[in-house]
Amino acid sequence: ENLGVRKAIDIAFGQAVPFLYDIDRDVCVECFSCVEACELDAIDFSQVPEEVAFNVGTIIIATGWDIYEPYGEYGYGKFENVIHQAQLERILAPNGPLEGHVHRISDTKKPKEIVFIQCVGSRDTERPYCSGVCCMLSLKNGKLLKQEFPEANITICYIDMRTNEKGFEEYYQRAKNSDIRMIRGKVGEITEDPETKN
C-alpha cells in the first residue's frame, strides 16, 4: 500500500514484540555502513533465515484480511481525497506517515466534511457476507477524527450497523452522542468539485 516509508533498519511496527530493530532486505542497499556504526557488533549479514521450534499451550490463528479495491463509482483512485479504511488507519497511526495528524491528501487542509461509506464490496450480489469489522472500525475512526476536528461534519452511511459484540452497542451510542451523523442507506454516487476537490 506504500502508506509510509520504512527505513532499512527499523522496528517492524510500534507494538512489536520483541521490540527490536531488524534489517528490511527490501529497503537495504547493502552498503554495510550500519555494520561499521554498530558499537555492539549486533549486525551480521551472514545470518540466514532459520526455522525454530517452540513448545506452546495455545496457537492463535489470525487470518487477517485482504484489501478490497473499492468500486470506481465511489471515486477511489480517481479523486485524491477518497481513501479506504486501511489507508485511514495508517494515517491515524501515531507511527504513520502523518504521525496521527490527518489532513486532506489534495491540499493538506483540515477536512470539514468526512463521510464513511460502509459495505463497499460486501453485502451485495457478488459478496453477500458482512466483513464483521468495518462498522466498529468506522465508529472508532469517526470518533478519533471528531476529537481532532470537533467542527468537522462526520457522517457514516451504512446498510445495517453491526454492533453485535459485548459493549459495541454502547460504543455506537457514544459515537452518535459525539455528533457523528448516522445515515442508513447506500451511497449512489460520489462527485468532486474540480476546483476545491470537495
Task: Show which residues each predicted segment covers.
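Short, polar loop motifs at secondary-structure junctions
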Residues: W65-D66, V187-E189
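A conserved beta-strand/loop element that lines the FAD pocket in flavoprotein oxidoreductases
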Residues: D41-S46, F54, A175-G188
